[in-house]
């Protein structure tokens, strides 16, 4: 599903008009979609009290249409005008005809009536400002937003729903005005706006739903929009096919180079995730002191012990051992739990930056990234297609910037550096991003604090490597892997909550997550 900027959304609406869809039809469809979402949230409209905060433009007109439908379905709907509407408002009279009560700031300068309405209603729809507003909030709009946020902290907290965008949220960047309230749900119209999937915007948007408004589906696909939200349908379409006459060689061989004396678990998690994602064979190359522990836990994995230094990290001489067998593997995963030292840096430099089999794919994570960042112009020496999976701190180290700089504009940061390095970048975090060198960025729909624990990144890396071993391209494997990882995390959260879940819980859920995704 395409994710759009304001200009791109305007372009799609104009293209829809050229294809015979009127702006009025788009507006009617938008209002109906929001009304249906509100009815679903309320468990039915009849007898429910709904307050629609109406602004001066098209967003407000959509809100009036929503109020009309809710009133038609039996709700007690009130349209509260935060700003003056046009004198000849084509959406006002039909709303009144269907029983919508209309009041507003001009009759309620102290906002006392607004406070009473919010105190009695079951649901509030924010239809004040849409994609056309980027100035700081002021005047009555700011005052109303402040009252809305204050209502959240009272004993009576109605459901807060935003129509397309919460008022005060920048649709392109996700920046928010200090007066922007936090919604329970945002119904994005047509396509989700980029700012709803960035932070702090996503936190203010609440749960995100996307409603079609009648824009012909082919228009977005034919456009040059290069930002996509990963969907289950997209993931299902790209999952590896497993023919009935398959054997273990059919599904590829992953080599996991990982672990150290202090981080045995990272090696285990990455290798086991590759196995559970469906790689035909997985080999773990780890320090000799890690080998007996890992071998006891990973009975389905082939083991390749490597020489180690006095601290239990892989010795630089281990690169010769690994390089001598590289032609046996389809994917090389390197970095998880390796630790950082001059020796591990030398090991990785000799392993990754020398001549390697041309068809070998690579995934580099965690300590592999930190070691890589110490090698001058490492990206010019990498061979073969590569996926990097940094969290924001690792991304800052790789780019020579800071974590706040990376987080301030995650999409452009991932896209820019993916192009510069000519690698696929998986920038982890809430709404993980997958950026490909050609400029396409995919966004994960998942935000799960339960995944903020040690080892979950190692699992993600193993999933991506396992999918690449089965023949998926780096960008597609990263997109599918991020979605599978997120969906497995949701399954864990549903079962035990988001406190106390561990990375191993994700691995247990991988086979059934993939099974469920394959079901139409």
What are these regions (language model features)?
Residues 1-82, 196-363, 370-387, 392-520:
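Small-residue (G/A/S/T)-rich helix-start motifs and N-terminal tracts that mark the onset
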Residues 36-130, 136-163, 354-361, 379, ...:
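Nucleotide and nucleotide-moiety/phosphate-recognizing core
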Residues 84-85, 107-109, 167-169, 192-193, ...:
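Short beta->alpha connector loops
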Residues 85, 130-135, 170, 176, ...:
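Short strand->helix junction
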Residues 93-95, 118, 176, 297-301, ...:
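Short low-complexity, flexible loop/linker segments enriched in glycine and/or proline
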Residues 122-123, 128-225:
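Internal gly/pro-rich beta-alpha loop/helix module
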Residues 156-158, 366-371:
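Ser/Thr/Gly-rich flexible loops in soluble cytosolic domains mediating phosphotransfer, phosphorylation
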Residues 165, 189-191, 260, 366, ...:
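Residues immediately flanking
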């Amino acid at each position: 599903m395409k994710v759009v900027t304001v200009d791109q959304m305007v372009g799609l609406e104009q293209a829809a008009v050229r294809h015979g869809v009127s702006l009025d039809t788009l507006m009617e469809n938008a209002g109906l979609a929001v009304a249906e979402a509100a009815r679903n949230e309320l468990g039915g409209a009849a007898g429910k009290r709904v307050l629609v905060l109406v602004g001066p433009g098209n967003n407000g007109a959509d809100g009036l249409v929503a109020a009309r439908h809710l009133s038609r379905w039996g709700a007690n709907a009130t349209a509260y005008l935060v700003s003056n509407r046009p004198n000849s408002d084509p959406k006002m009279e039909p709303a009144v005809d269907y029983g919508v009560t209309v009041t507003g700031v001009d009759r309620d300068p102290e906002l006392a009536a607004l406070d009473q309405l919010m105190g009695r209603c079951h649901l509030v729809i924010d239809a004040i400002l849409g994609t056309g507003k980027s100035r700081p909030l002021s005047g009555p709009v700011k005052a109303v937003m402040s009252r809305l946020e204050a209502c959240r902290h009272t004993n009576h907290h109605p459901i807060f729903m935003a129509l397309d965008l919460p008022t005060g949220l920048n649709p392109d960047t996700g920046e928010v005005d200090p007066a922007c309230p936090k919604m329970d749900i945002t119904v994005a119209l047509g396509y989700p706006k980029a700012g709803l999937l960035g932070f702090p915007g996503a936190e203010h948007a609440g749960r995100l739903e996307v409603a079609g408004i009648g824009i012909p589906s082919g228009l977005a696909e034919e456009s040059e929009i290069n930002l996509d939200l990963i969907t289950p349908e997209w993931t299902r379409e790209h999952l590896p096919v497993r023919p009935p006459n398959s054997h273990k060689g059919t599904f590829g061989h992953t080599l996991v180079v990982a672990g150290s004396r202090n981080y045995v678990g990272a090696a285990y998690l990455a290798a086991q995730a590759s196995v559970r994602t469906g790689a035909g064979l997985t080999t773990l190359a780890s320090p000799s002191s890690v080998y007996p522990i890992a071998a006891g836990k990973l009975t389905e994995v082939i083991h390749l012990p490597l020489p180690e230094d006095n601290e239990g990290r892989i010795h630089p001489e281990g690169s010769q051992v690994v390089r001598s067998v590289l032609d046996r593997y389809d994917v090389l995963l390197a970095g998880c739990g390796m630790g950082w030292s001059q020796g591990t840096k030398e090991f990785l430099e000799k392993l990754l930056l020398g001549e390697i089999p041309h068809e070998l794919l690579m995934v580099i994570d965690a300590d592999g990234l930190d070691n890589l960042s110490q090698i001058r112009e490492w990206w010019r020496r990498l061979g073969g297609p590569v996926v990097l999976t940094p969290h924001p701190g690792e991304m800052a180290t790789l780019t020579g910037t800071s974590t706040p700089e990376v987080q301030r504009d995650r999409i452009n940061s991932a896209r820019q550096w993916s192009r510069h390095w000519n690698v696929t970048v998986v920038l982890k975090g809430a709404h993980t991003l997958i950026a490909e060198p050609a400029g396409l960025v995919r966004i994960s729909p998942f935000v799960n604090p339960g995944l903020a624990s040690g080892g979950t990144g190692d699992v993600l890396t193993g999933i991506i490597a396992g999918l690449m071993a089965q023949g998926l391209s780096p960008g597609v494997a990263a997109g599918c892997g991020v979605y599978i990882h997120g969906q497995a995390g949701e399954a864990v959260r549903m079962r035990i909550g988001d406190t106390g879940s561990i990375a191993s819980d994700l691995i247990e859920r991988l086979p059934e997550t993939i099974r469920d995704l394959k079901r139409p």
